[in-house]
Amino acid sequence: MDAYEATKVVFSRIQALDPDHAAKIMGLLLIQDHGDKEMIRLAFGPEALLHSVMAQARKELALLPPPQAASSSPTVPAAHSPFLLSRQNSGRCPAPSPSSWAQAQPFSRSNSMGNGGAADEMVGAGEELMSPLNGGGGAAANAPPFFPRGGDALLDDFELQEQLAFLHDGAGGVNPGHALQAFDGAECRSPGPGESGGMLPYGLAWANGGPGHRRSASVNELCLGGDGFGWKPCLYYARGFCKNGSTCRFVHGGLSDDAAMDATTAEQQQCQDFLLRSKSQRLGPAAFPFTPTGSLPASPSATSKCLSLLLQQQQQHNDNQRAAAAALMLAGGDEAHKFMGRPRLDRVDFASMMNPGSRQIYLTFPADSTFREEDVSNYFSIYGPVHDVRIPYQQKRMFGFVTFVYPETVKLILAKGNPHFICDARVLVKPYKEKGKVPDKYRKQQQGDFCCMSPTGLDARDPFDFHQLGARMLQHSNSANELMLRRKLEEQQQAAELQQAIDLHSRRLIGLQLLDLKSSAAVHAAETTTMSLPTPITNAFTSGQPGATTIVESPPSSTGQLMASCGSPSEGKVVNGGNKADSAGEVTRNADSDQSGEHNLPDSPFASSTKSTAFFTATAATAIGSEGDFTTGSSCNIGGSAVGSANPLRPPTLDIPSPRTCFFPMPRLSEHGAIGM
């Protein structure tokens, strides 16, 4: 069954019980709008539940019960009514009537109302129900007077009366204790917006999360001005449009300065009070979960309107502050920062962030000084705002650093000069310098120089120097990112220096190994040469003379035979060993080494005929024996076979190893005396 069919069933049941007032009772139930589930519950509920609902509606509408209904069916008291007043239908457990939760009436009637005024007041206090007419007790006293209920306008409070006008056809039958009576400002007394003292300032009213009806603005809340009109501004007119026009009870025009200031303050106070009440209203159902308002939602629209108003006022306040700051910047110049809440960042601040050294100074002072960092800050605050003072905690402190907010303060202090006296201590001020500036001479002393003393002749000063690069890059920077960059550069520099040292060491070891190989080869060749027998070697390529010979001394156990060099018969010469005894002084020490072989090489393998003739006509004889004489010998053929195997002076078991093997194309003589290759 849907809500429409349930409504028809409920109306038919009410019409069967009370046909005279069925339309009014049904209209009240529809206006209250308890939900579809509650309507279905009334349609299928017992007769006692329907009688209790009808009796409660008659009390609210001030209707007399029909005589047959009073005699036939007893009504259930309102205090024991199981009817659940819930807008969200979140629970099905019955709740007692809100009459037991009713508060005292906020209105105190005067004695001019007649003798029945006290009795009517007592009846009204005893029959306080959830009605759009009586407002649910003290809710009207706590409602904000100038803010709409549930997001509606202020004049929308009377729309409910217009909707319920058809319910009050008979004016004579209305109970004066339940009817809404009009009171002027002199006949009523109502508490102010902030005079509510309960945890639930809205009471226990269920309609729209607040009071069912709100009274008109009272005199003490309207704040009448001297001309008799209220100076409260119209919020709708301030936003651009007011539907009431000239008949609006609030001011649409401009206000005086004092009135506008008071109005703004009052609006802010009302907004804050309303937000506090809405917060307590949200906390109230949590504290009393079984109250009729335990499941009622709060009014988000009114809260959002108050928040929007507060945000708008805050934005206007910020705009005013910006305008004042701009005026101070234009008029005051450098002194504007003294009147502002906090200094704003400009180009100078960004430059000082990139170059923190421009905002710092370096202090030097005697070691026996007794001043503290606070004393230094108080002294230099005369020149400008001080950001930080750093003095190292040492036994003999002699230096410190002061950081200012503006770099102009540093320029002013440096321009003043030295000395400064802080607590009778002489303090010298110097400009701050970055650590990255390393002089070249210290860097050269720290770096090794192996260009001349190295055995390999290598220059160790390779281009792996990152100090100068890092000094240039980090000269005007001290931020976190640049500190990380500095660390990376240092790590790269250390890695490069380590690699450089490894390369130099490996190259130096390679050079030493090459030198060891050369020296060992030379020593081995010399040792093998001294073990062999002596052989006369004709050094015709270097000396150029036919008779020049190189003689190597032989041991005394030689055989005494001679070896003669052959030449032409016309140019043969006898060399006397006795006359040439002093020729032994011309013996070279490195005759058998590889250097001598290199020097004996001709300039060209194709030698001229004159040099070849001079070489083959030169004769030399060596006689080794007891007499020690050199004799002449016949010519012999010098060839590879004669030197290698036909030499009678060489022992057959010894070979002379040569450190180098070279091929020499030697010329030979023909039978006719011509030289052939």
Swiss-Prot record:
It comes from the Eukaryota. InterPro entries: AtC3H46-like_PABC-like, AtC3H46-like_RRM, Nucleotide-bd_a/b_plait_sf, RBD_domain_sf, RRM_dom, Znf_CCCH. PROSITE patterns: RRM, ZF_C3H1. Residues 480-513 form a coiled coil. One of its GO terms (molecular function) is RNA binding. Keywords: Coiled coil, DNA-binding, Metal-binding, RNA-binding, Zinc, Zinc-finger. SMART domains: RRM, ZnF_C3H1. This is Zinc finger CCCH domain-containing protein 23. It comes from Oryza sativa subsp. japonica (Rice). The lineage of its organism: Eukaryota, Viridiplantae, Streptophyta, Embryophyta, Tracheophyta.
